[in-house]
Amino acid sequence: MQKYNIWEIRKKISSAYLAEDIVKEFNLDSNMAHILKSKELGTLADIKEFLYAGYESLLDSFLFSDIKRALNRIDAALKNNEVIYIYGDYDADGIMGTCILYKILSSVSSNVHALLPNRFKQGYGLSCDMIDKLKAADTSLIITVDNGITAVKEIDYASKLGIDVIITDHHECNEELPQAYSILNPKKPNEPYPFKDLCGAAIAFKLALAMIEQKIASYDICELITLAMIGTIADIVPLTGENRIIALIGLNEIKKTKNLALIELMDDANLNPHEITCADIGFKIAPRINAAGRMTDANETIRMFCSNDRSFVKSKVSVLSEINKFRQTEEKKIYAQAAQIVEHENPDSRYIWVLSNPSWHEGVIGISAGRLAEEYNRPFILISESDNICKGSARSISGFNIFNAIKNSEHLLERFGGHSAAAGFSINKKNISEFERRLNEYAYENGISKLLYNTKYYDYESSDGIFTQKFISDIELLSPFGYKNP
């Protein structure tokens, strides 16, 4: 297909300083100063915070409106030796967030447990069947990680059984919120927490920090922020604001990590901890962590991250590496089959592509959908077909909210969830055709046409000679580089 690439210079925000002020204040290369002018940094103090961020730059966890209520319930549960279950998600973000809360809470009580649903048996999020099992284990408090914000029915059911639920989630909210004991989600309506793009692991980390501050529990925050960093990079949230701070600190802390799982994962990927980058986490570490949840069961990955038995950890890393190789093979197969259909039918014939196949592995379709969306610059939805209820995964393009598009057809779905860039859902096979029709109608009515020109932005134009040793050294201060911080 024809590529529609348009390059535009990023708009400079109004600021009370000149590039010359930046050069003088921070002893930076003049070209670097002009690049900083394109960032959303209104004052020289903002620039200082951006360039030299540390733990003190993290936002106050107590800005979450519901966090005191969550802390009080957790404190009471620990003091009363109640059974607590941390119920996470099976992707790298959910696994890291679950590990964070399990590590800190289990350091206080032996009645703390971690559980991830099986993608193929229970599917995403809380279910009434799982709540029954937790009730049978005398659970009185569930803390969700990276899920729960749409589990209205399930949390009502838990409440009737006498189980309190604290939700930590970053996905988009529906009109009706669950009647949970406490909800920590920056996207919650009227939520005052100022940074809205935290991932699930980062929210779990913020809750852990608040526990430490309130002396409810204590733990090495260097290890916890390293796990939050992995979740942040793996979930491809914008590397701006607090996310960039978490990634920056975590990439520094991983250099001296004592976590055996991280040490063995880096060794398996042939990575030097002292030279590890955001790309290494995103393309080498995160896929290995994701592999179990995509292809089998991720609960052993939790055990691996919490174990001090090197032989056990080494064996689990080896298994993950093999599973990841199988995942790569499946992903390439799905991509090739889908791309062949698209090319045969003309890539421009749809605003949103919806493709289904009974042989497509439901744990891998999201990755393939992301590659296709990037290649053809339009949203892609891939569905793993079955005789009745099918599983789908959606990936979007910049500027088009796929969550809202899917929500517009929620009456055709069994369940769904996600955010502006990605979503997952279950759908009856008989509804797929109508679902595709409505999605494309919605896309047309909401102006997707103007987004199909793949606009790429750059920060600065300069003459030859920009790449001095000083400039190359200074540019590293903008790292870590990733989504929304190229």
Ranges and model annotations:
Residues 91, 148-151, 158, 165-173:
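Hydrophobic, well-structured modules enriched for small/aliphatic residues and gly/pro motifs
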Residues 256-259, 444-486:
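A contiguous loop/helix-start segment that scaffolds small-molecule binding in enzyme catalytic cores
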Residues 151-152, 235:
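Intrinsically disordered, low-complexity regulatory tails of plant transcription factors
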Residues 115, 145, 168-170, 184-186, ...:
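Generic beta-sheet signal
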Residues 120-122, 151, 171-176, 190-192, ...:
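Short gly/pro/ser/thr-enriched loop/turn and capping motifs at secondary-structure boundaries
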Residues 75-76, 172-185, 344:
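Acidic-glycine-rich active-site phosphate/pyrophosphate-binding loop
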Residues 100, 178-216, 221-233:
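Short alpha-helices
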Residues 2-4, 11-141, 161, 212-437, ...:
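Hydrophobic helix-and-loop "lid/oligomerization" segment in the mid-to-C-terminal part
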